């Protein structure tokens, strides 16, 4: 086999793999009249013009570690009964909360959505393994730097102040209207995490936009957030 033949065969195999990956997203079930984020924007999307001047796309390796650590540290705090904030008192300890691990596919889908700089949830983001939940946060500053990623996650944690501990065993619709980011963070069955981010300058502000995707998805009405 010549070198050219070998390269051609490698190219064909790579193309087949790429097409298979794209087709997988097309096969996933989405809500009526919606399309999967990866089908709309492709697997190699770039930041939208809507972002303004982009200063950074995607969390750095250090930020990935910080994101994962913050989620797990806070999960430990809640699971051990040390979270004292909340309606009707602090949050009860958890029996079944797992540590989260980083998931590259979730991060890829999250980054594709973050690249759009739209502070709304995308309509379809599931992967073949499970349905996917999502948290969004954006914070701005007029300084030269961008808000640290941990500060964005803490916005979700702070929602616990509005969460009634009596809703842990069966989540009502009212339980996610103000506190859905918090409940997704501590949802016991969500043990995979992947996030995307954009640091951009727009309208005179330095903005840090964070999208975190969680699998399996949490925030199912009528189900327990975690076991007490």
UniProtKB/Swiss-Prot annotation:
Domain (SCP) ranges: 69-214
GO CC annotation, single: extracellular region
Subcellular location: Secreted
Keyword set, alphabetical order: Allergen, Disulfide bond, Secreted, Signal
Keyword Signal recorded: yes
Span of the signal peptide: 1-22
Organs and tissues of expression: Expressed by the venom gland.
Record-annotated disulphide pairs: 30-124, 51-117, 195-212
Family note: Belongs to the CRISP family. Venom allergen 5-like subfamily.
Protein name: Venom allergen 5
Organism: Rhynchium brunneum (Potter wasp)
Phylogenetic classification of the source organism: Eukaryota, Metazoa, Ecdysozoa, Arthropoda, Hexapoda
